[in-house]
């Protein structure tokens, strides 16, 4: 090709003119006039918003929320973390149904029983002491003594005892003494069994002959869930879960690092 001459390229045909669609004009009713609201400070009434975040909650609610968040954020040692693994609903229902049969007598029932016994004695029919029926034993000290003497057949511990130090040693003690134990949701549920508001732990010592098979089934299921899994539970730490803000911040940093690396590699 001789110098000074430029190669002529093919001319591209111009794009066809885009045919604009004629939009039909909206008919505006003059009776409906626009009244735009101004939500600035001191202007119109603010719209209804979810202000839960800004409520000044009572102290006990604040504390329980902070405790729940701390349990998520901090590393929770296995001894405390094991109380998050409660018994499944079906087994817990069966257990409570059985425990309901062995509720201790109320103060009124005891009063009536002693009154009837006193009346018999006054009538000269002789005083025959009644045999103590098998009932649930409640309270940390009572249950600890029963476990140490290997008299407890099954120990039920509440998962939400506060302070947790009251019962934190019980699972290890039960395992050492070979007593089956389980952790159940709700100290209030256990409290209802023994006519109190709350209860930390209850224990079965004896049951009637008709309930022995039901208790044996429960003990078998509980033993596989708790006593036999003790080594696994002992290694499992809890918590260490970051909040949404921290997760977002870390994700942002990671994204920036990845972008920087991509530009370096080109």
From Swiss-Prot:
Keyword Ribosomal protein: yes
Repressor is among the record's keywords: no
GO process annotations (BP): maturation of LSU-rRNA
GO molecular function: RNA binding; structural constituent of ribosome
Modified residues (N6-acetyllysine): 34, 97, 217
Glycyl lysine isopeptide (Lys-Gly) (interchain with G-Cter in SUMO2) crosslink location in chain: 11, 20-21, 48, 97, 125, 245
Subcellular location as annotated: Cytoplasm
Subunit structure: Component of the large ribosomal subunit. Interacts with CRY1. Interacts with DICER1, AGO2, TARBP2, MOV10 and EIF6; they form a large RNA-induced silencing complex (RISC).
Role description: Component of the large ribosomal subunit. The ribosome is a large ribonucleoprotein complex responsible for the synthesis of proteins in the cell.
Similarity-based family: Belongs to the eukaryotic ribosomal protein eL8 family.
Protein name stated in the entry: Large ribosomal subunit protein eL8
Species of the source: Bos taurus (Bovine)
